Amino acid sequence: MQKIRKGDKVVVLSGKDKGCSGEVIKVSPKENKAFVRGINMVKRHQRQTQKQEAGIISKEAPVHLSNLAIADPKDGKPTRVGFRMNADGNKVRFAKRSGELING
């Protein structure tokens, strides 16, 4: 089970976007990287095709998972993630900072 998944709200711990938060769009577990909406934006030069015009577009670049932390559901501050079994016997994620369950 992954600590950071698609749809999670995360906080950037280091880098040019330190302190910013956003939603995870995609996770690459093999590369230990994630794409976060609005974080680590880079400009790419787009060649003209039949469907798209030429120009410079901004898109998200991947961020290493070690530079991300889940945002605590209670107050939005960065927290570590723990795992425990719920009453149904399913493994669930929880925020170690507040003890709140993390959706997903």
From Swiss-Prot:
Record SUPFAM superfamilies:
Translation proteins SH3-like domain
Q: Where does the source fall among the domains of life?
A: Bacteria
Q: Where is the chain membrane-spanning? A: none
In its UniProt record, which GO terms are filed under biological process?
A: translation
Q: Does the keyword Lipoprotein apply?
A: no
Please give an example of a GO cellular component term from this record.
Answer: ribosome
Select a single GO molecular function from the record's annotations and give it.
structural constituent of ribosome
User: Is the Ribosomal protein keyword given for this protein?
Assistant: yes
Q: Which residues form a coiled coil?
A: none
Q: How does it assemble?
A: Part of the 50S ribosomal subunit.
Q: Which family does it belong to?
A: Belongs to the universal ribosomal protein uL24 family.
Q: What does this protein do?
A: One of two assembly initiator proteins, it binds directly to the 5'-end of the 23S rRNA, where it nucleates assembly of the 50S subunit. One of the proteins that surrounds the polypeptide exit tunnel on the outside of the subunit.
Instruction: Give the protein name, as stated in the record.
Output: Large ribosomal subunit protein uL24
Q: What would be the name of the gene that encodes this protein?
A: rplX
